[in-house]
């Protein structure tokens, strides 16, 4: 049986490499949430939290320019580019028991260092908005614009 598998891989190298890469990527993306200990929150669940949860902090990690064009109501802008220089850690001490939702532009631009920064200062309930702000906008949910 093993000889048959090895001969197949030798005869079809290109197909075998593509198959192996596909398997590795599938396993990685399946276990990504577990490996990085990050929880995602759906847009609908975030809307429920905005309406009913008073212990909620929404942090928009996009640039200030994008934030001013439109953001989720009651969110604060802390760009992921300069999170450590902008943030006064003592400010976040009062939010340690809050649920923190971090909004990136989309799921492809999640910065693990940004999330880990908030974990390192003692914030435990950290969620990432699935689909990011692009997902929010594509569903035509309301935004607040500051000009």
From Swiss-Prot:
Rhodanese domain segment(s): 52-145
InterPro entries to which the protein is assigned, alphabetical: Rhodanese-like_dom (IPR001763), Rhodanese-like_dom_sf (IPR036873)
Organism for this UniProt entry: Buchnera aphidicola subsp. Baizongia pistaciae (strain Bp)
Alphabetized CDD domains for the sequence: RHOD
Coiled coil: none
Name under which the protein is recorded: Uncharacterized protein bbp_050
Cystine pairs: none
Family annotation (Pfam families): Rhodanese
PROSITE patterns, A to Z: RHODANESE_3
Lineage, top ranks: Bacteria, Pseudomonadati, Pseudomonadota, Gammaproteobacteria, Enterobacterales
Domain of life: Bacteria
